[in-house]
């Protein structure tokens, strides 16, 4: 069976990126909660 993690930067950015989060009300709530919590990063690093 194929492993579940098949790295793809474009897919990662489109699914979990900042602009993807801003696009939906739920995504904006995610960013809001992460800001309140004081997270260093609001979204996963894509180009790392």
UniProtKB/Swiss-Prot annotation:
Keywords: Ribonucleoprotein, Ribosomal protein. Residues 29-42 have a biased composition (Basic residues). It holds the Pfam family Ribosomal_L34. One of its GO terms (molecular function) is structural constituent of ribosome. It comes from the Bacteria. One of its GO terms (cellular component) is ribosome. Gene3D superfamilies: 1.10.287.3980. InterPro entries: Ribosomal_bL34, Ribosomal_bL34_CS. PANTHER family: LARGE RIBOSOMAL SUBUNIT PROTEIN BL34M (PTHR14503:SF4), MITOCHONDRIAL RIBOSOMAL PROTEIN 34 FAMILY MEMBER (PTHR14503). Part of the 50S ribosomal subunit. This is Large ribosomal subunit protein bL34. The gene is rpmH.
């Amino acid at each position: 069976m194929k492993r579940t993690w098949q790295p793809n930067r474009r897919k990662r950015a489109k699914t979990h990126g900042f602009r993807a989060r801003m696009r939906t009300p739920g995504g904006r709530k995610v960013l809001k909660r992460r800001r309140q919590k004081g997270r260093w990063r609001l979204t996963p690093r894509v180009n790392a």
